[in-house]
Regions:
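Glycoside hydrolase catalytic-domain context in secreted enzymes
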Residues: 1-499, 510-516, 522, 572-1000
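Terminal connector regions
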Residues: 493-566
Length: 1000
């Protein structure tokens, strides 16, 4: 028989290959285990199983409100459309352009017409791949669309060449701004469809869309942005101005309107970032584009465009009101001069560099103070009208296109029987609202504003006052022509307080005259108050834009300065200065002095360039990643760990936060359980077997439940938050919240990263779609209603981002400087209302620093303000912290942070290993676990759990699969190596016996 040649080469290759695969699997397993938390969340992989004990009670603590997923989804689709229909604001409507006549035939223009902005980008983005488009929404209302033009805009060639461009990733740098592009199609690209225009000439509807997103602020043209990038051909680098192609489009449509091809031109503003509206006013822009109607629709969410269709067709009458001041030129906003971050000019001298996700040498100054949005535009207007010294050269009418609160209707309304009564702790405003139109039914938003006196005491102590502040609102039911409704609005006296940071160092109520008025918008409110003071258009030489209505004004006089009524917070906590270290004029870090904008000297204090600060040794030391030096390690007794007390987390259902039994439960925790829960909190809270704690799933976001980062289940995408606020409808947004809670309950989520509560400081913040407004009152009131709805289904919210994350540029560590009055009255007010009125459980802190102190390590913010003054009992989670060293574990724990939004043990888990014997830090961990567990035990995570149930740790299936793969590959490697060894021996044997064979 012929001998078979040994297969040495084959077995060598197979042995090498299986060995490489084995090593790769082992390395992959190591890497996967570092991201086990993220993988478990993404794959919905359990790390435990429940061992049920005896129980006869109902453990479904939070019940679903829908019989099926289909019922829930259908209801929410209608709800989203309703929010859009009540939130969109009609800005202009001439020549009866709107509503469209029944059966109208229209042409849709602009790339945005086929590619709407449904929401922003980043962690709050949602899947809208199945969302209806504008064509479908209009056709559902009996409107016929120019199919030829639609097909052209939506063709592959047009979509690839002229699509809107946005930043490709979350980068947080100024350079990301240059990735935004309008990229509108030039008029010449539409020539093939021009012959179809006349047949669909009832209206030319132009959609102007602008995108925003996480990690990238919008370019204003003031930051070196390439002109050519913004428009596709030419422009001024301002993303919120019309591009050259958009101007060309409007010019050509005007020509076609003039020759009779189109009857009307209608513009839809599809953006949560306020576009400059000079093009709507020929006297401002110098050219008449023939625009008959304009409507702001924001970001429409998954089905909100159906609401737009209802508005355009007249099925619903517009009732939304703007929640931002819209300008002709956005640079008229004083905050713009300090919006984009600055570098300390001597940062390198102190090694304050940006390394990876740690920004050390960048800062931003809120130099405008409380004068955000209408608080500036209307206050300076009042001072100009009254002839106040140093008011300067300011013309409201050429600055403001549409004021905060503005919203037109297809009908008209009248207010009468205005009355205000005072009680011990509130003012009650009543009035009658009548639909005075003859054709359309509709709702009306009633807005109540007040004015606080700007006194000599204020001027002496650096207190600023706005000419008007929103303090109450209500929305009527649908009123038929001629119908009326009596409206009652309660204004708590706490709305009148102002913060005195320099003398009383608490909230005060000034002595003097206070004015209350019912108004249609902020400008109307100031004119009413001016009228009550005796000012008219005539006696101010036209400085007043229109006469106010004194019948809608009521004056209340406070006889003496009150420094005590509002000087205490929750549980009697004294309210006093907490944020001096964020004020460069008071901070021990002394980066320099800042002149705050003041109405006592508009001309001398309005910024004309960014505020200049410099670094020093003290500031550099305050910016160190870790300040704790271990000196407190033995200052407290080491907490008990790993006790066998027999309690489970479910046994704490219904127990008060201060119940002594919590200590017994906390004694059972192990150090590793605390570290795992605290340092690996990316979209979850971890299971803890010692107390029978289940793992929970947390997810974004501001427009509804989305799993953009983890790949899990998503649900209804509602409108952007500004559209929600623009409804001015508390009950409607409470229902949105309830349905978001239903989505979470149906899909197994217990926590929601949202709502977003930062401010629209300027129009250029990338995440304005996630935030409600420039005004903290409407933002806080609407947020509180949404929070109540969400949490009614056992879903704890994380209000984000507390606080001052009002821009994206350099956000990972930027030093934010502001004074205390501004912090409290503007930037913390939404959280205040959401927690005290809405009962919000938890917060997510910002990436940014307050002065030199990271939000999550700011004890005055977390422990002093949130837990002390507001009485918050839930948890404080960081923003994403997996790659940032400045978001320090020990400093954060000491300040009051509880859980780090990190998917990897690389930084914080590793650091925790150094503190197992530090009693002080272990105590802080125990306190953090108390906050976490108290939140979870009051959530839907406890559905199905009884006090007798326990938990057993198991290996998740994907880890078992990897271990099995490694084992199989290892066995194959051994077998291949064995076969290789045999082959080598056989080959050697053949070589050794070859001569003998030859001799035969």
């Amino acid at each position: 028989m012929k001998n078979t040649k040994p297969k040495v080469r084959l077995w060598s290759v197979l042995t090498g290959l299986t060995a490489i695969l084995t090593v790769a699997a082992i390395v992959g397993n190591i890497i996967a285990n570092q991201y086990a938390t993220t993988i478990n969340v993404a794959l919905n992989a359990s790390t435990y199983k429940i061992i049920h004990g005896e129980n006869t009670g109902d453990t479904e603590y939070f019940k679903k409100g829908f019989a099926s997923d289909e019922e829930r989804e259908a209801y929410e689709a209608e709800l989203c459309a309703t929010v859009e229909a009540e939130g969109a604001a009609l800005l202009k409507n001439e020549n009866n352009a709107l509503p469209l006549a029944s059966g109208a035939k229209v042409s849709l223009f602009g790339h945005g017409s086929v590619d709407l902005m449904y929401g922003g980008t980043g962690s709050g983005s949602v899947d809208t791949s199945k969302a209806p488009n504008l064509k479908q929404a209009l056709e559902a209302q009996g409107i016929t669309i120019n199919q030829t033009l639609w097909d052209l805009y939506s063709s592959d060639s047009m979509m690839s060449k002229y699509s809107r461009m946005t930043p490709a990733s979350i980068s947080d740098t100024l350079e990301a701004n240059t990735q935004y592009a309008v990229n509108e199609a030039p008029w010449s690209a539409l020539s093939s469809a021009e012959s179809s225009f006349a047949e669909y000439g009832d209206a030319a509807i132009v959609v102007l869309s602008r995108s925003g997103g996480e990690g990238a602020d919008l370019p204003s043209g003031e930051n070196g942005t390439s002109d050519s990038w913004i428009s596709g051909q030419e422009g001024d680098g301002n993303y919120l101005a019309l591009s050259a192609e958009e101007v060309e489009l409007l010019q050509n449509l005007k020509a076609l309107k003039d020759n009779g091809t189109f009857k009307n031109i209608i513009v839809l503003i599809n953006s949560s970032n306020a576009i400059e509206l000079d093009f709507l006013n020929p006297e401002i822009c110098g050219e008449d584009y023939g625009i008959d109607a304009a409507m702001w629709i924001g970001d429409v969410g998954q089905t909100g465009i159906n609401g737009v269709g209802q508005l355009l067709s007249g099925a619903v009458t517009p009732s939304g009101s703007l929640v931002d001041t819209y300008l002709y030129d956005n640079m008229a906003n004083p905050a713009m001069y300090n919006f984009y971050t600055q570098a300390y000019p001597n940062a390198a001298e102190y090694n304050l560099l940006t390394e990876g996700a740690d920004v050390q040498g960048m800062y931003s100054v809120y130099q405008e103070g409380i004068y955000l949005g209408y608080r500036y535009f209307e206050t300076r207007y009042e001072d100009v009208v009254m002839g106040t010294a140093k008011a300067g050269d300011y013309n409201w009418a050429t600055t403001v296109a549409y004021p905060f609160g503005y919203g037109d209707s297809y009908t008209t309304f009248a207010y009468s029987n205005f009355n205000v009564t005072e009680s011990d702790d509130a003012f009650t405003v009543t009035l009658k609202v009548t639909n005075t139109g003859k054709t359309f039914s509709g709702k009306e938003t009633v807005q109540i504003y007040f004015q606080s006196p700007y006194t000599a005491y204020d001027k002496a102590n650096g207190i600023e006052k706005a000419a008007a502040e929103l303090c109450g609102f209500a929305k009527t039911d649908v009123l038929a022509p001629g119908a009326s409704e009596d409206v009652t609005i309660t204004v708590p006296k706490s709305e009148l307080r102002t913060y005195d940071a320099n003398n009383a160092k608490t909230y005060i109520v000034d002595a003097g005259d206070y004015y209350f008025t019912a108004a249609t918008d902020s400008h109307n409110a100031v004119n009413n108050i001016l009228a009550a003071k005796g000012y008219t258009v005539e006696n101010t030489n036209g400085r007043m834009t229109e006469n106010g209505n004194t019948d809608l004004v009521w004056k209340w006089t406070n006889d003496t300065l009150d420094t005590t009524t509002f000087s205490t917070g929750a549980n009697g906590t004294a309210i006093t200065n907490l944020f001096d270290e964020s004020d460069p004029n008071k901070s021990s870090d002394a980066p320099g002095s800042v002149t705050w904008m003041s109405r006592s000297d508009w001309t001398g204090t309005i910024p004309t360039a960014p505020a200049q600060l410099t670094a020093n040794e003290t500031l550099a030391a305050s910016l160190a990643f870790t300040k704790y030096d271990g000196s407190e390690a033995n200052s407290v007794e080491m907490p008990t760990l790993g006790a066998k007390n027999g309690l489970t987390l479910a046994s704490m259902i219904g127990k008060d936060f201060d119940d002594p039994e919590w200590d017994t439960l906390l004694d059972q925790l192990t150090y590793s359980e605390m570290v795992n829960t605290i340092t690996l909190g990316f979209h979850n809270t971890a299971a803890a077997a010692s107390i029978g704690k289940t793992a929970t799933k947390d997810e974004n976001g501001p427009q509804g439940l989305t799993a953009a980062l983890t790949g899990g289940a998503s649900a209804m995408c509602y409108t952007s938050e500004d559209v929600m606020a623009a409804t001015f409808n508390v009950d409607l947004i409470n229902e949105v919240g309830r349905c978001i809670g239903e989505d979470c309950l149906a899909m197994g989520y217990s926590g929601l990263y949202g709502p977003g509560i930062n401010m629209h400081r300027t129009a250029y913040c990338g995440r304005n779609f996630e935030y409600y407004s420039e005004d903290p009152f409407v933002a806080g009131t609407i947020c509180a209603a949404e929070v109540q709805g969400i949490q009614s289904k056992g879903v704890y919210v994380y209000l984000k981002h507390v606080a001052l994350n009002d821009s994206e540029t350099s956000r990972r560590g930027v030093n934010t400087w502001l004074n205390e009055q501004t912090a409290r009255e503007i930037y913390l007010e939404v959280a205040d209302k959401a927690i005290t009125d809405g009962g919000a459980w938890s917060v997510m802190t910002g990436f940014n620093r307050w002065g030199a102190t990271w939000c999550g390590a700011n004890a005055n913010l977390l422990t002093g303000f949130l837990r002390g003054e507001l009485g918050m009992r839930g948890m404080c989670i960081t923003d994403f912290s997996g790659s940032s060293q400045y978001m320090d574990l020990v400093d954060g724990l000491i300040a009051g942070s509880d859980i780090w939004d990190s998917p990897t043990p690389k930084i914080h888990t590793t650091k925790a290993a150094n503190y197992e014997n530090d009693a002080y830090i272990v105590t802080q961990m125990r306190n953090a676990m108390h906050h976490i567990l108290y939140t979870v035990v009051n959530s839907n995570a406890m559905n199905g759990w009884a006090s007798t149930d326990t938990l057993k740790t198991i290996t998740p299936w994907w880890q078992t699969a990897i271990y099995a793969l490694i084992a199989v590959l290892a066995v194959l490697t051994i077998l291949c190596a064995w076969q290789l060894s045999k082959a080598i021996k056989a080959k050697k044997s053949m070589v050794d016996t070859a001569p003998a064979a030859d001799q035969k």
